[in-house]
Amino acid sequence: MTEKYLSVYRKKVPAIDNEIEVYTRPVVDLQMRLGLMDRFPDVLQILTVAKVPLEKFVGPKDAVELARIANDELAELLVKYPNKFFGAAACLPMNDIDATLEEADRAIGKLGLQGVQIYSRIAGEPLDLPKFKPLYEKMAGYNLPIWLHPETNPALDMDRGIFSWPYETTAAMLRLVQSGIFYEYPALKFIVHHAGAMVPFFADRLKWFASATKLFTQNDPKIYEQFLNFYVDTALYGNTPALQCAYEYYGAGHILFGTDAPLGPRWGMIEGTIRSIERMAITEAEKEKIFSGNAIELFKMAL
């Protein structure tokens, strides 16, 4: 959370402190974060605003103001620390879709950010509602990704996200596939966390349900293949067998190096995640794609 963004957010919604108190200090302390990053000089980060969706706490007017502040600060950090931060995903005021489209244009076209971030539900509403389609059309036009972060589900979060977040991610992926959005916008790209959540593990189950039931509304017996449009990260706390499962499903070309830093144990398990990729039974060229090549191509960046 950037400095001015958090300061303004706190004034508008004092309860925000209850949400961020479980986070580690590097989420809000830039100098501590930079110091920790010095331990991994070969690792660059893509910045996103920490998980407190604007639409969850503030109305549309305040959400627009806060999103603009956050994105301005993200862009400033990219300029100030080019050897630390590789890019950033824009924060959006999703409770005002017209303002969301304007801010996406400003963040990408003017500020030079590399995509946008949304959540698995928008103020409790699913992502396949028609009112969100203009954002998907816009991002497909930019050929830049949408980061999809799981939202908190009060009915499931007694585990503080251990299993509820992968479920939230998977449910959102399913609704997007069922909606046929990837048929409509073939260039649309989503990045989901935790190696694709439940999808790789249940790949054959998905295939069976798609062919044998009416779960999928699109008239395509191979609609399950649309799950392969997602990109996934490696944030599994160093679990090589799970990464291998994701690789067997997605292939190396849709896996991006990612951790929970600056959250999680040992500062996001950066070292453990690196080791887990190095232990995978894949070629060195494929490992290089996961570590950096896919990101460079997807975000249209150069090191």
Tell what function each PLM region has:
Residues 1-2, 149, 194:
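Histidine-centered divalent metal-coordination motifs
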Residues 23-28, 55, 93-100, 123-130, ...:
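Acidic-and-aromatic substrate-binding clefts and catalytic sites of carbohydrate-active enzymes
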Residues 157-177, 189, 194-303:
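H/E-rich (His + Asp/Glu) clusters that bind or coordinate divalent metals
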